[in-house]
Amino acid sequence: MKNITTIITLYKPPANKLENLNQYKDTNLLIFEQETSGENQRDYKKIFQGKNIEYFFSKKNIGLSKSSNILLKKVKSKYCLFTQLDIKIDKKTIIKLLNVIKKKNDFILVSPNHKKNKKKKYYEITKNIDFSCILIDVEKMRKIGFFDEDFFLYWEDIYLQNKINRSPYKMAIINNAFVEHHSSQSSITSPKIFYIRSLNFIYGELIYDLKTKKLRVIKIMRMFIKNFFLFFFKILTFRLKESINKLAIIGGILKFIIFIFLKK
């Protein structure tokens, strides 16, 4: 599978998930790790049993969109497997994805079946797809552009999906290619990471509303006021995780407001 490059972005990955990198040993592997000084590079190269691995890093958390775009620009093969550390996939599944996308000139990306429900159709063209594991036709994706870097962690896939649906290209689910996604297990669990995820989900939602012209000022005001009071209520009732979530929503709104002012 030399004509496939696998790209994975990492942020505080759990040690027990790193063995999953060997699922891609027959492909070229590109890793981008965030918020690190690159000290883990040797560990990844020791774990990975394949021949071709390249490692990139940033000292700051620059977000999924930006780090993924950096990796896609470095891909030299015709096809690219965009995936995550908490995905379980085998070689047969990757080959099934490859066999379909090679034959269909209008397919920009294909996804395995996450539900494991057998269907008569070999593949289904769809307008909605799970972006956690997709095989991409690199040339086609470069024509329309990958992730919008105004998004940090969430909603970039939905925005890209809309862009693909407006293009001449199609997306498809390959029904006999199965994959397991142990969602939200690609990073260690901590209050800080929970806060970052929650903040950027709200931030991404507001960015999406802005770009699709669905944004309403009244929505932002209501969301801010509601979660401002709920934050203190959760603190007083000792519901720490819920209070972190409310604080993250407030943080996401403030991050969006800063984004708007910096864009002017």
PLM regions: where:
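Short aromatic/hydrophobic "clamp" motif used to bind/position activated sugar donors
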Residues: C80
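Active-site donor/metal-binding and catalytic loop motifs
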Residues: I173-I193
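Short, well-formed alpha-helical segments that are part of the catalytic scaffolds
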Residues: T9-D26
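A short, conserved alpha-helix in the catalytic core of glycosyltransferases
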Residues: I134-I136, K140, I144-G145, D150-F178
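Short beta-strand/loop segment that forms part of the nucleotide-sugar
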Residues: T27-G38, F56-S58
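Glycine-rich, basic loop-to-helix element that forms the pyrophosphate-binding segment
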Residues: S58-V75
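Conserved donor NDP-sugar-binding/catalytic core segment of glycosyltransferases
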Residues: K88-Y122
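Non-catalytic, C-terminal membrane-associated alpha-helical segments of glycosyltransferases
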Residues: I196-G204, K213-K264
